[in-house]
Amino acid sequence: MIDVNKFESMQIGLASPDKIRSWSYGEVKKPETINYRTLKPEKQGLFDERIFGPTKDYECACGKYKRIRYKGRVCDRCGVEVTSAKVRRERMGHIELAAPVSHIWYFKGIPSRMGLVLDMSPRSLEEVIYFASYVVLDPGDTPLEKKQLLTEAEYRDKKAEYGDRFKAEMGAAAIQKLLADVDLEKEAAELKEELKEATGQKRTRAIRRLDILEAFIKSGNKPEWMVMDVIPVMPPDLRPMVQLEGGRFATSDLNDLYRRVINRNNRLKRLLKLQAPGIIVQNEKRMLQEAVDALIDNGRRGRPVAGPGNRPLKSLSHLLKGKQGRFRQNLLGKRVDYSGRSVIDVGPSLKLNQMGLPVPMALELFKPFIMHELVKRGLSANVKSAKRKIDRSDDDVFDVLEDVIKEHPVLLNRAPTLHRLGIQAFEPILVSGKSMRLHPLVCSAYNADFDGDQMAIHVPLSDEAQAEARLLMLAAHHILSPRDGEPIVSPSQDMVIGNYYMTTEDKGREGEGMIFKDTDEAELAYRNDYVSLQTRVGVQVSAFPEKPFTDDQRGKIMVTTVGKLLFNRIMPKDFAYINEPTDANIQNGVDDRFFLEPGQDIHEYLENAPLVPPFKKGFLSDLIAEVYKRYKVTKTSQFLDRIKDLGYYESTISGLTTAMSDIHDLPEKPEILDKAQKQVTLITKQFRRGLITDDERYERVIGAWNDAKDEVQNKLIEHMDIHNPINMMSDSGARGNISNFTQLAGMRGLMASPNGKIMELPVKSNFYEGLSVLEMFISSHGARKGMTDTALKTANSGYLTRRLVDVAQDVVVREKDCGTDRGLEVTAITNGNEMIEPLYDRIMGRYTMKSVFDPKTGEKIVGKNVLIDEEMAQKIVDAGVKKVTIRSAFTCNTEHGVCERCYGRNAATGDRVEAGEAVGTVAAQSIGEPGTQLTLRNFHTGGVAGNDDITQGLPRIQEIVEARNPKGRATITEVTGEVVSIEENPAERTKDITIKGETDTRTYTLPITARMKVAEGDFIHRGAPLNEGSIDPKELIQVRDVLSTETYLLSQVQGVYRMQGIDLLDKHVEIMIRQMMRKVRVMDPGDTDLLPGQLMDISQFRDANKDTLVAGNIPATARPVILGITKAALETNSFLSAASFQETTRVLTDAAIRGKNDPLVGLKENVIIGKIIPAGTGMSAYRNIKPKEVSVAAYSIKDIEAKLKEEDKQN
C-alpha cells in the first residue's frame, strides 16, 4: 500500500482499453453469480474466485491449500490464488464487448463532449449511436459529405447509386472511427483562426470547441476513448450479495446491471458468429448500448431500468451522487469506532473541563485500555481473561477503570454541529446512571438543553490525538466565540437570577447602615440574620489590600451591599471591586461617590443615595470577557465555575417563585383600547370618503393598534414592582422578556394571518383574562407559522452553511506576511441615520496599513503594521478619526489562503492568529451558524406605493453570496457628474434622470414609484444608486473596481446580520467575498496560450502574463468576474472537492477529459483520500516535528487485537 501522507497530487483521466485490461485480473464471461446449492461463486461469473480472489482468507476454492503459509500460491486444481480475502475489494475484472459502446457521460452531458469534438449536434449523435441513422465516414468521390446523416432508405438509395465508392456506418463503432479521425492540432489551429473574426453565437461555439480540443491535446487523452471496447467490472465485495434469513438473497443493483450487459454481449457474440441478418444484429447492438448506459448512469437517457417493485436500479453514477453517495456518505463522513451516544443531563457540580461518563459506557469505550492495565497489574493472566473479567463486571475492573480514564480526554459532539464549538474535549468523571452529564456553561456553545437531547462521545486513541484534544479542544479554552470574539460561556437562567438577586440593593432592609471591618464580619452578620443580602452597608477599604483602590480611597469606608461583598469574593484577587454594573467600574475601579467622607453619617448618605441596579446577564458577560483578557484560560475557567456555583446556590436560597398573583390587572387598559377603537373608526371613515387609499387605511389601522399595545406595555412597566419575580426574571436576562409579560398582563396585540400579512383584528385579551374563541383561533395561525418557519429555516440555513464551507474550505493562514502594499479603507457602516457597524468594531483586532493620525492635533496615534487592540481602537474613535486603512483579506496576496497580518487577531483566543488556522472554515461557520436566527421572510415595509419590499434575513444573504440579481434593484449611474434634471412622465409612469458627466451625459429611466436617493443639483460618483434598493454587484463591478464591489457586499451582509442583532466580524465576511472574486474572464489572450472567454484564477492569469511579458510578448487582458458561492465552489482547482459538492458526474466528466491534477491543497480533498489535512498541526511545517522519546513506548490497540488473535490460535 502507498502511504497516503506521502503523495502530493492526484490525477484523473480517460482510461484507454489497454489500461482497463491492465487493471483486470480476468474476463467475466458469464452472467452467473453464485451456485444456488453450494453458494460458491460460479466460474467465469461475476463473483469468480479465480478472477477476484478467494472468498475465505488464505484458502483456495477447492480447499487444497489452507493457511497463510501457502500465501501467493495459485492452486493447480481450481486456479485460485491463496491470499487474503480483502483482495476481493480491490481486484477488478473486465468484459470484452462484441461491439464498441459509447460512454453516456461524454455523449449525453451538457454540453455533449463528443458533439463538441466532432462538431455534430447531440441529436445527430443519438440517431447514429442508437441505430436510427447512418453517418458517412468517407464520402470517397461521391457528392456526399463527411459526417452527413442518412436514413435507412437514403442509405439504400445511395448504396444502389454509388456502390462501394463511399463508406457509411451506424452505431458507436461509426462514432469511434470519426473520433479517431479527428486531427486535434489541425482543428484547434483552424478554430483559433476562425475566432479572430467570428462573433455572436458562432464565436461562443468556437470557444467551447477550442476549449475541449485543447483539453484533449494537453491531457494526452484520445477522443476515441470516449467509446469503449472493454468495460471494467467492479470488485465483487463492493457490490456484494448477502444471504438474508429465510434463505433469500439481497444483492447490489450493480450485479443486475452487469448481468444484463453480459447477457446481451454474449447473445451479440453468438449472433455475429452465426452471421445473423443485419437488422437482428443491429437491434442487439442497440440493446447492448442501452445496457451499458444503464450500468453507467441509469435514467440519464430514456426510461430508467427498473428492478423488482418498479424501483429504478442504482447505477455506478448513483453510487457517487448526493448525500447518500460515496463522496458524502463514506469519504467525507465516516462512522468511527470508540464512540457512543447517550442522553445528556445537567452536571452542576462539574468543573468547566469535565463531563460525567456513565460507568457502562466507560467500560465499553475504554475496553482495550482496561484490558492492558489488568494484564500489566497482573490481575489477569492474559488479554482473553481480562476481556472475560470486563464482560463479567469483575470488581478488579472498577479499581482499574478510575486510573485508565484519568487524564484521558474525550470529545463530546452534539448534532447539528453548526460551528467548531459543536465538538469540545472534556475529562471524563465516572457517574452512576446511564446519562452523560454536561457542564451547564457549555450548553450555549452546543445549543443544548436537557429535555432529552442526546450527545455523541468519541475517544481519541493515539498520544498525538490525546495531546491535541487536551491542548487545543479542551472546553476551558473555548471561552470566546470565533464569530465575534465575545464570551460564549456565560451564565444563563438560574445562575443569572442567583447573581441578580444577590447584587440587588434595597432601601430600609434590616441592619441598613451597619459598618463592617471586612467581608468575613459581614458574612457572620448575614448568617446570624442581622443583615440581608440586599442591605446597604459600609465596609473598610483597608480590608482589600490587593484591590486597586486609590490612595485617597484606602482610608475611607465604602458603601456597598452584603451580597456584593460576597460576590466580589469570587473575583480574582487583584481585580477591581465591582460595586456597580458599569464598564467604568471594571476598568477604573469604584467611583468616588460610593465612599464616605471622614465623619459623614452613613444613614444620612443612604437617605439620598439612589439604588444601584443589580448585575444582569450582559454585565456578567462583560466581566467574563475582561477576566479572560487579563488572566487567560486557567483563571477564567475557575472564575466561571465560581460564578456558576454562586448563582445556583443563591437562586436556591432566594426561593423565587412565580404565580398567577404576580400578574396584576392594568386599570388603564379599557381606556387605551377605547381610544384606539375610535381612531380606527375615524380612519375607516376617511377611507370611505375617499380621502385615503386602502393601503394607507391598512397601514394606519395597524399603526393605531400597535401604538395601543405599546402604550399598554409602557404602563405595565411603570406599574411593575422591582421585586416582582416575573419582572426579575426578564430584567436579569434569565428568561423571557417584556413582551411575554405584556401578553400575560396587557394585551396580545395583532396577529399574522397565514399569508404572512398582519390581520387588522387585534387580540385585545391577555392570557390572565383568557382569550375568546375567535381570538384563540386567530392566534393559532401565528403559532403554526412559527413552527413551519423554524423547520424550513433550519434546512435553508444548513444548506447555506454547506455551500459557504465548500467555497472557503481551502483558505488557511499560510504565512506571516504576504507583503501587500494595498489596504482597505474602513469607515463606520451606516444606513441613512442608522448605525449598522461602528468604526470601533471594524478596526479592532486588525493590522493597520498606514499610520493613523489625530485629525485635530496631527499626532500619530498608531503606527503602520500594528495590531489594533481595544485600547488603541478606543483612542482612534475618541480622537474623532473617521477613516482607517487596515490590512484586509480582500487585498491579501497569499495564494490559497491569507497571511497573519491581513487576517488580524484570532477572535476565539484574542491572540494573533497562528499559521495553520483554518480561517476559511471558521468564517463559513460563523456566517452560517446564526443563519437559523435570521428571518426567513422578506420584510414587508407595508403596501405604501413605491416602497418596494426590501429583501431581508436569510433570503437576502443568499441573494448576496450567490450573486443573484437582487429583488428591488437600484439603478446605478455609470458616470460621475451632476444630476441635471429629474423629469416625471405620468403617461408612461416613469421618471427620467439625467446626469451630466465631464465627457458624456446619461439618462436613466425609472418607474414612477421608485424612491429617489438623489435630487437635482447633487454631484454623484459613478456606481452610486439613484433610487432605494439593492445594487446588483455584477453591474457595480463593471462600473467601479473590485475593491469597492467587495466593500459594498461586505456592508450589505453586515447590514442583514446587525439588523437582527447578530454581531459578526468583518474578517469572516471578507474571506467569503474574496472567494467569490477569485476568478477573471480572459477578454483578449494576446500572445499567451489562454483562450478568450476562459474563466481562470487571478493568480494563474498573473503567472501566464508574467511569462509572456518576460518573453517580450503581448500580455492577455481579462476582467474580474463575481461568482456565486455555488459556482465558485464548483470552479475550484480541486476536482475532488467540486465533485463531492454538487453535480458530481459533470465535474468528473470534465476533469477526466482535461486530465485534471488535484494539488490537494484544500481540506476536503485530503479528507476524501484519507490524508492528514493541511491545516493546524497537519501543515507540512508542523508535520516533521518529532517528540523526544522519554518514557517506555506506548502500546497500541492493534497490538492488543493481535494478541487476542494469537491467543485464539493457541487455544
From Swiss-Prot:
GO molecular function, one term: zinc ion binding
KW Zinc (keyword) present: yes
Any GO BP: DNA-templated transcription
Cofactor: binding details: Binds 1 Mg(2+) ion per subunit. Binds 2 Zn(2+) ions per subunit.
Keywords: DNA-directed RNA polymerase, Magnesium, Metal-binding, Nucleotidyltransferase, Transcription, Transferase, Zinc
GO cellular component, one term: DNA-directed RNA polymerase complex
Binding site for Zn(2+) 2: C818, C892, C899, C902
EC primary class: transferase
Disulphide-bonded residues: none
Required cofactor names: Mg(2+); Zn(2+)
EC number: 2.7.7.6
Domain of life: Bacteria
InterPro entries reported for this sequence: DNA-dir_RpoC_beta_prime, DNA-dir_RpoC_beta_prime_bact, RNA_pol_asu, RNA_pol_N, RNA_pol_Rpb1_1, RNA_pol_Rpb1_3, RNA_pol_Rpb1_3_sf, RNA_pol_Rpb1_4
Binding positions (Mg(2+)): D449, D451, D453
Binding site for Zn(2+) 1: C60, C62, C75, C78
Catalyzed reaction equations: RNA(n) + a ribonucleoside 5'-triphosphate = RNA(n+1) + diphosphate
SMART domains with a match to the protein in the record: RPOLA_N
NCBIfam families, per the entry: rpoC_TIGR (TIGR02386)
Family: Belongs to the RNA polymerase beta' chain family.
Role noted for this protein: DNA-dependent RNA polymerase catalyzes the transcription of DNA into RNA using the four ribonucleoside triphosphates as substrates.
Assembly notes: The RNAP catalytic core consists of 2 alpha, 1 beta, 1 beta' and 1 omega subunit. When a sigma factor is associated with the core the holoenzyme is formed, which can initiate transcription.
Name of the protein described by the UniProt record: DNA-directed RNA polymerase subunit beta'
Gene source species: Limosilactobacillus reuteri (strain DSM 20016) (Lactobacillus reuteri)
Lineage: Bacteria, Bacillati, Bacillota, Bacilli, Lactobacillales
Name of the gene: rpoC
